């Protein structure tokens, strides 16, 4: 199951709304989207049904009724469980220094931060991170192409590379979820999805005002993939999003 599901890329709409020039239009049209008819159907279901009637109300409740220290702490626990996955993937990339940032974050926040409820590790500048590292990004770092765009019901946007990465990441964590119980995995991903959506509530209208929300979201998704594969170093283009925006997309 995806760590953060529908509309976690909403903030990207800020830089993508409006009319594109000829060069931009050409680049957009060259995206690998051979399943566009199917994808648009799934997009409408996710956006008009799942988000509108499930995620958005849950996100509003998360913001309005859950005290900030509690919501941040619960999200911290969920995110802390991704650190071992990032540690392994960084080692596969031959990046031991970055790998041990995740390793140290995990044990420090687990032992001293009540399982990640408090992010003690980020008190050290050297242990602060912007994104976790999935196996999909690891494949991308070795030059594996993302592949065709796919929109699945509830799961939302993905590609063959990212789906493969999600399966491998899940395999890393399988023994843990077997130990604590599978339903807790759903709780983890649910908390991350609602927390991510809650952070983007104020930007929903920007996506609705886009000339083609489907294209807007698709471009944001591909830019986000490139951003994460390159560790926050994005090749500049007329459609590129600011770094501070991309850091909030996961």
Swiss-Prot record:
It is found in: Cell outer membrane. A lipid is attached at residue 19 (S-diacylglycerol cysteine). The keyword Phosphoprotein does not apply. GO terms for cellular component: cell outer membrane. Keywords: Cell outer membrane, Lipoprotein, Membrane, Palmitate, Signal. PANTHER family: INTERMEMBRANE PHOSPHOLIPID TRANSPORT SYSTEM LIPOPROTEIN MLAA, LIPOPROTEIN VACJ-RELATED. InterPro entries: MlaA. GO terms for biological process: intermembrane phospholipid transfer. It is a lipid-anchor. A lipid is attached at residue 19 (N-palmitoyl cysteine). This is Intermembrane phospholipid transport system lipoprotein MlaA. It comes from Haemophilus influenzae (strain ATCC 51907 / DSM 11121 / KW20 / Rd). Belongs to the MlaA family. The keyword Nucleotide-binding does not apply. Residues 1-18 form the signal peptide. Pfam families: MlaA. Involved in a phospholipid transport pathway that maintains lipid asymmetry in the outer membrane by retrograde trafficking of phospholipids from the outer membrane to the inner membrane.
